[in-house]
Amino acid sequence: LHNIIETSGGAVVCEEMCTGTRYFENLVDESKTTLDEQFMALSERYMKTNCACFTPNTGRIDDLLRMVKEYKIDGVIDCSLKFCCLYDTEKYSVSRALKEAGTPVLSLETDYADTDAEQLRTRIGAFIEMLND
């Protein structure tokens, strides 16, 4: 997906996917000394993750709006994995919040198969062209 965006004239300045920046946010507190404290610190770190599985999840929308401002984002590509019902459920709320904030949004769904590549390239290219107008 990043390659398609960048070869279509866009720039990925930030991302909020499951395996992306979330992995590095809210690191585990390593100052705990007992096993119980360490397990609690690990649990707290996982529970701070703003994932669609914690619906309703206003924290995720707040994070997205913060990132749009912080990284001066022109438009958001909201991509979800096909058949990930949790992200599909949240897609409407995310799109509405971003549009209300004046940020253009392109919602995509893919299974990351090679057969999706050209359709994604067409939609992403049109979105980037719209942002540049």
Question: Which role does the model predict for each range below?
Answer:
Residues 92-133:
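Peripheral docking tails and interdomain loops at the edges
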